[in-house]
Amino acid sequence: MHSHDETPPFRFCPVCGSPLEPRVLKITEPKRLVCTNASCGFVFYLDPKIAVGTIIRIGERGRIVLVKRAIEPGYGKWVFPGGYVDRGEEITLAALREAREEAGLDVRLDHLINIYSYPGRAPVIIVYAATMISGELAVDDEGLEAREFDLDEIPWDDLAFRSTREALRDYIDGKVTAPAK
């Protein structure tokens, strides 16, 4: 079941400028935005947003890094460093970039923990386990605080997102989907 029956975010065809309208093209797929100009027929596919995250291990004790968010959604709640992948950016490079931007750390990606997606939610979240190789723990303008936590100190009741909780549990349980490429 698809939940794409909201008001379309785009109203005009990017090719010819004619209005777009939602239409069912295949019974097994959600409605697509289609150009009303029959000679154009452009189909606008609304792709999901892709986000990456890194659960960063620091030191021999295996402490992990969490960042307290300074933005909504989840203001004041804890997450691992992460964010959106830019168009054309490699997933692994986005994960490295986000670790540097949000926590001030250069990391080595060790393995893919999992990919998280939820019905009716736009982002698909790709989460890696990583090890700090250099840098000083710091936050950017999207964070209030960055901190190291022992695994038994994780503030479970103050985590920002379902994907944060699920990825941390998978990390602690040792679930590994694949080596990082």
Locate predicted features:
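NUDIX/MutT-family hydrolases
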Residues: V139-L168
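Active-site-adjacent beta-strand/loop module that shapes the phosphate/pyrophosphate-binding cleft
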Residues: Y116-L137, R147, A167, I172-K175
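Conserved Nudix-box catalytic region and its N-terminal flanking loop in Nudix hydrolases
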Residues: H2-S3, I58-E101
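Acidic, metal-coordinating catalytic segment for phosphate/diphosphate chemistry
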Residues: D5-T54
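A short coil-to-beta-strand element that immediately follows conserved catalytic motifs
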Residues: V24, D106-I113
